[in-house]
Curated annotation (Swiss-Prot):
<dbReference type="GO" id="GO:0006412">
    <property type="term" value="P:translation"/>
</dbReference>
<dbReference type="InterPro" id="IPR000266">
    <property type="entry name" value="Ribosomal_uS17"/>
</dbReference>
<keyword id="KW-0699">rRNA-binding</keyword>
<dbReference type="GO" id="GO:0003735">
    <property type="term" value="F:structural constituent of ribosome"/>
</dbReference>
<dbReference type="InterPro" id="IPR012340">
    <property type="entry name" value="NA-bd_OB-fold"/>
</dbReference>
<dbReference type="InterPro" id="IPR019979">
    <property type="entry name" value="Ribosomal_uS17_CS"/>
</dbReference>
<keyword id="KW-0689">Ribosomal protein</keyword>
<keyword id="KW-0687">Ribonucleoprotein</keyword>
<comment type="subunit">
    <text>Part of the 30S ribosomal subunit.</text>
</comment>
<protein>
    <recommendedName>
        <fullName>Small ribosomal subunit protein uS17</fullName>
    </recommendedName>
</protein>
<comment type="function">
    <text>One of the primary rRNA binding proteins, it binds specifically to the 5'-end of 16S ribosomal RNA.</text>
</comment>
<dbReference type="GO" id="GO:0019843">
    <property type="term" value="F:rRNA binding"/>
</dbReference>
<dbReference type="GO" id="GO:0022627">
    <property type="term" value="C:cytosolic small ribosomal subunit"/>
</dbReference>
<dbReference type="Pfam" id="PF00366">
    <property type="entry name" value="Ribosomal_S17"/>
</dbReference>
<comment type="similarity">
    <text>Belongs to the universal ribosomal protein uS17 family.</text>
</comment>
<keyword id="KW-0694">RNA-binding</keyword>
<dbReference type="InterPro" id="IPR019984">
    <property type="entry name" value="Ribosomal_uS17_bact/chlr"/>
</dbReference>
Length: 112
């Protein structure tokens, strides 16, 4: 039987050679038939300590490695890029300042 594989996001990397991966799945409510997000956290073995919080990783079922660890990181699918987010936030701040400046000029001109 093949081993189960899942894709999730690293939510904690504070332990040595272990990461906590949150896996999100959609289930249908039994009565209302609406699809709901369900999240479960798995402890996964990270041999090289290369995963960081925010990384999207693929984990695979393995033999029990500790009391709670039964998964291992197979590969990092996408790295988390905080620099890109900071640049986007700075651009948004600049645009807001420009808009606020234009609004102040319009109000100042109307009062005179």
């Amino acid at each position: 039987m093949p081993r189960k594989r899942m894709i999730g996001v690293v939510v904690s990397d504070k332990m040595d050679k272990t990461v906590v991966v949150a896996v999100e799945r959609h289930v249908q409510h039994p009565l209302y038939k609406k699809y709901i997000k369900r999240t479960k956290k798995y402890h996964a073995h990270d041999e090289k300590n290369e995963c960081r919080v925010g990384d999207v990783v693929e984990i695979e079922e393995t033999r029990p490695l500790s009391k709670t660890k039964r998964w291992r990181v197979v590969k990092i699918i996408k790295r988390f890029e905080p620099e890109r987010i900071l640049k986007e936030e700075e651009e948004v701040q600049d645009e807001l300042e420009e808009i606020e400046g234009e609004v102040v000029e319009e109000k100042g001109g109307a009062e005179s």
